[in-house]
UniProtKB/Swiss-Prot annotation:
GO terms for molecular function: GTP binding; GTPase activity. Protein transport. Probably involved in vesicular traffic. GO terms for biological process: protein transport. Pfam families: Ras. NCBIfam families: small_GTP (TIGR00231). It is a lipid-anchor. Belongs to the small GTPase superfamily. Rab family. A lipid is attached at residues 205, 207 (S-geranylgeranyl cysteine). Keywords: Cell membrane, GTP-binding, Lipoprotein, Membrane, Methylation, Nucleotide-binding, Prenylation, Protein transport, Transport. The gene is RAB7. It comes from the Eukaryota. The keyword Calcium does not apply. GO terms for cellular component: plasma membrane; vacuolar membrane. This is Ras-related protein Rab7.
């Protein structure tokens, strides 16, 4: 039976409440945006199948709550992550200042085997707000912080308009892939019901 090789890549999105983590994830996976804000309770995730160099990968993107009272949930959700995405709102300085706290918390709770080289990606979201007139975190400032932490890739995004979202997540996926050990999942291309083959469980991917 023909089979496809698919690798699961786990990505964690962290940042203060309201910076647009859920919106970025929904824009990338579902091509949808909602103006109605609803705080994430605990954690949630979406999956998307992507392909690089004739290989299939399933991105499992975890959106965690930014509220302090849920941070104790971190250990269970952070463990096994292949890449961590840190998001701030370019219009809210506090959300940028807190990036270091989120980064440190992830490293403590996830306990990656090589913390010095663990892949992070930083997103400066909501660049569309007020035509950019409300922003208080400059691109230069954000890039300088990323450089000081080991040259973390940086993207400015708008979840609302879809600006730079695909490019950012392609970088995220490629960085996650570099960190993933060589473990592959073999999935059948077709299911022969007559021979008693079991249907494959849906991954929830938006393919």
């Amino acid at each position: 039976m023909a089979s496809r090789r698919r690798m699961l890549l786990k990505v964690i999105i962290l940042g203060d409440s309201g910076v647009g983590k859920t919106s970025l994830m929904n824009q990338y996976v579902n091509r949808k945006f909602s103006n109605q804000y609803k705080a994430t309770i605990g954690a949630d995730f979406l999956t998307k199948e992507v392909q690089f160099d004739d290989r299939l990968f399933t991105l499992q993107i975890w959106d965690t709550a930014g509220q302090e009272r849920f941070q104790s949930l971190g250990v269970a959700f952070y463990r096994g992550a292949d890449c961590c995405v840190l998001v701030h709102d370019v219009n809210v300085m506090k959300s940028f200042d807190n990036l270091n706290n989120w980064r440190e918390e992830f490293l403590i709770q996830a306990s990656p085997s090589d913390p010095e080289n663990f892949p992070f990606v930083v997103l400066g979201n909501k660049v569309d707000v007020d035509g950019g007139n409300s922003r208080v975190v400059s691109e230069k400032k954000a890039k300088a912080w990323c450089a000081s932490k080991g040259n973390i890739p940086y993207f400015e995004t708008s979840a609302k308009e879809g600006f730079n979202v695909d490019a950012a997540f392609e970088c995220i996926a490629r960085n996650a892939l570099k960190n993933e050990p060589e473990e592959e999942i073999y999935l059948p291309e077709t299911i022969d019901v007559a021979s008693g083959g079991r249907p494959q469980r849906s991954t929830g991917c938006e393919c």
